[in-house]
């Protein structure tokens, strides 16, 4: 019996509720490693700034996410949760939340059909037609929950938007929307009617929001959490620096030292990935389209090449671009026998995985596959091209996720409590003083001692003694 069928009479869909005690023990450990998030929980618990908030959450269902969910609840929110990736759920984390009463719809290894079913179910807060039928807030990672509302609402008026799916993902999404409309023709309009805003976790999701905002089609307010400095410069860089190689090692037990590793993309995620591979003494090459990022890579001592050049020479390939078709079928056809291919960007289309379906696949273990080419060459594909650090590992450490999730919580409070200050259809970032607040809270765990400005020094550089210390244009 699948997780989905087990939950037909219950308001959750998880793998195994008996894992809850294990999950709870790990949640307690994570809480001790998440100082900023726990400090915000303590600061706002009495005032309940999220009382009345109905939060639809679509974000990797991990132990660290469980701490975020319970923080939102401690501040007064009602929460329904699904994972934003079919492989990223930690089943014991999901079980712990369900045991505590949270509706969670996630298990590791979901089908795409289950994924979109679960994403629909996190919008079902109350009876049809009631004032509390749907959410009034979305917390998103990658933008799928936001996409579902927008595309579904468009399809209510024009079914042709679902006519030409371009991928397996789109085929399942479009089928799910068609099925929902067949049973309830105004479901998306009603579910989206009360949504005040969305807070978005990732670069990919932010790009989607900005595109909709530019076109004038974004239905609600949005806060770009990704570009908070204490998110992008820490989660994206330092988180990936630890979790990438953890995922690769767990999946393959490969010796990294001496091998040629190619990192596609040298943004914050690529920078962390390159640092991690070099720390294990790999020869790291970088591919880039942006001359500024390419120059940064070169100045750090990395060799900057094209994927066409690297394809038949490297041993390990990592995509970190947020784009599509970065590693093509032709690239993989040229690769060495036993080359390792993985992705730490958001979606699986960075690698042309669909082009490999015509070949024989041999599962080595869950999320680790040999792809056998006609000449019997094999490449090792990790997590089927989805996030390797969460598909083959446990994702980022708790400490760095504390910064990200503290920003998410602050953003939820800000949008819910002060929605009138934000214009519908616009994308905002959190102010600098809140970024600095998160950093201060994180530093306490490290026993760091901050130097304090005198009033004379503050006047000299034109800031307050309490900050903010940098202009919004400052690049950390």
Swiss-Prot record:
This is Adenosylhomocysteinase. One of its GO terms (biological process) is one-carbon metabolic process. It comes from the Bacteria. It comes from Myxococcus xanthus (strain DK1622). Substrate binds at residues 62, 141, 201, 231, 235. InterPro entries: Adenosylhomocyst_ase-like_sf (IPR042172), Adenosylhomocysteinase-like (IPR000043), Ado_hCys_hydrolase_NAD-bd (IPR015878), NAD(P)-bd_dom_sf (IPR036291), S-Ado-L-homoCys_hydrolase_CS (IPR020082). One of its GO terms (cellular component) is cytosol. The keyword Transcription does not apply. It is found in: Cytoplasm. The gene is ahcY. Gene3D superfamilies: Adenosylhomocysteinase-like, NAD(P)-binding Rossmann-like Domain. Pathway: Amino-acid biosynthesis; L-homocysteine biosynthesis; L-homocysteine from S-adenosyl-L-homocysteine: step 1/1. Its EC number is 3.13.2.1. Keywords: Cytoplasm, Hydrolase, NAD, One-carbon metabolism. Belongs to the adenosylhomocysteinase family. May play a key role in the regulation of the intracellular concentration of adenosylhomocysteine.
């Amino acid at each position: 019996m699948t997780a989905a069928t087990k939950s037909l009479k219950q308001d959750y869909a998880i793998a195994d509720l008996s894992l809850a005690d294990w999950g709870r023990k790990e949640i307690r450990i994570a809480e001790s490693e998440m100082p900023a998030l726990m400090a915000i929980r303590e600061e706002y618990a009495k005032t309940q700034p999220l009382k009345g908030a109905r939060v639809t959450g679509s974000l990797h269902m991990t132990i660290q996410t469980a701490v975020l969910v319970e923080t939102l609840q401690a501040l007064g929110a009602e929460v329904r949760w699904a994972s934003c990736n079919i492989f990223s759920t930690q089943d014991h984390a999901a079980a712990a939340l369900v045991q505590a009463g949270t509706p969670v719809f996630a298990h590791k290894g979901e089908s795409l059909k289950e994924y979109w079913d679960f994403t629909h179910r996190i919008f079902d807060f109350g009876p049809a037609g009631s004032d509390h039928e749907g959410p009034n807030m979305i917390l998103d990672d990658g933008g799928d929950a936001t996409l579902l509302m927008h595309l579904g609402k468009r399809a209510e008026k024009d079914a042709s938007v679902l006519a030409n799916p371009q991928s397996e993902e789109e085929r399942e999404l479009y089928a799910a929307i068609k099925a929902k409309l067949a049973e309830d023709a105004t479901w998306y309009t009603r579910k989206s009617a009360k949504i005040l805003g969305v807070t978005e976790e990732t670069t990919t999701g932010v790009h989607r929001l900005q595109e909709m905002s530019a076109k004038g089609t974004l239905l609600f307010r949005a806060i770009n959490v990704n570009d908070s400095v204490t998110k992008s410069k820490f989660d994206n860089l330092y988180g990936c620096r630890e979790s990438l190689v953890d995922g690769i090692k767990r999946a393959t037990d490969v010796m990294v030292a001496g091998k040629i590793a190619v990192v596609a993309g040298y943004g914050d995620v690529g920078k962390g990935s390159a640092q991690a591979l070099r720390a294990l003494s790999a020869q790291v090459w970088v591919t880039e389209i942006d001359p500024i990022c390419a120059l940064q890579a070169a100045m750090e001592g990395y060799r900057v090449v094209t994927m066409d050049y690297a394809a038949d020479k490297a041993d390990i390939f990592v995509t970190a671009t947020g784009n599509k078709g970065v590693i093509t079928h032709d690239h993989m056809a040229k690769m060495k026998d036993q080359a390792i291919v993985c992705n730490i960007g958001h979606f699986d289309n960075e690698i042309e995985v669909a082009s490999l379906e015509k070949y024989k696949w041999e599962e080595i273990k869950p999320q680790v596959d040999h792809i056998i080419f006609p000449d019997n060459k094999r490449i090792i594909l990790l997590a089927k091209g989805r996030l390797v650090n969460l598909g083959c590992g446990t994702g980022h450490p708790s400490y760095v996720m504390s910064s990200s999730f503290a920003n998410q919580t602050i953003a939820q409070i800000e949008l819910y409590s002060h929605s009138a200050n934000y214009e519908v259809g616009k994308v905002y970032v959190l102010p600098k003083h809140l970024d600095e607040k998160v950093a201060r809270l994180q530093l306490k765990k490290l026993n760091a001692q901050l130097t304090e400005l005198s009033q004379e020094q503050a006047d000299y550089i034109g800031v307050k003694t309490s900050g903010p210390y940098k202009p919004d244009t400052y690049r950390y």
